[in-house]
Amino acid sequence: MKKIPISREEVKCIIKQKIILYGPIFINKSNNFQHVKDFEDLVRTVVTMCNGDEQERLREMEDWIVKNEGTWVLAEGFNSFLGNVLHKADWPSDARVAMLRLLAYGAEQDDIVLILHMDRKDHLVMNYAQQFDRLPIREQESLAMLVGIIL
């Protein structure tokens, strides 16, 4: 099944509708991110599944998240890595939760624009968000946190 790219506004609308249908998800916007822990969780969960290029993306993410160098350190290949984390069924849900929380942290820091810009062609985040009601609860919560901050 081919995913159809949709606009950011349509994704917001879909998520709002599904939150209304399935009950509220409470979003903590108190700047209480545990971004280093989330990054460590992501690494621990996926490092053995990553090829050399993907491990390089993890090193770049370390510069972004842990060393606070900004998203400009992420290479173009980050989008492919993001797609693997969000869309590969054999990758664990914990990896998606950690990645979404890291993206939410980036959004809170006004540092997500570059990532969204890289995603303008493939719409990986928006296509993932379209399946909101079919996601595990922890993924729904993390995605709602990301969208809530972007809104």
Regions found by a protein language model. Name each.
Residues 3-4:
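Fungal intrinsically disordered, low-complexity polar regions
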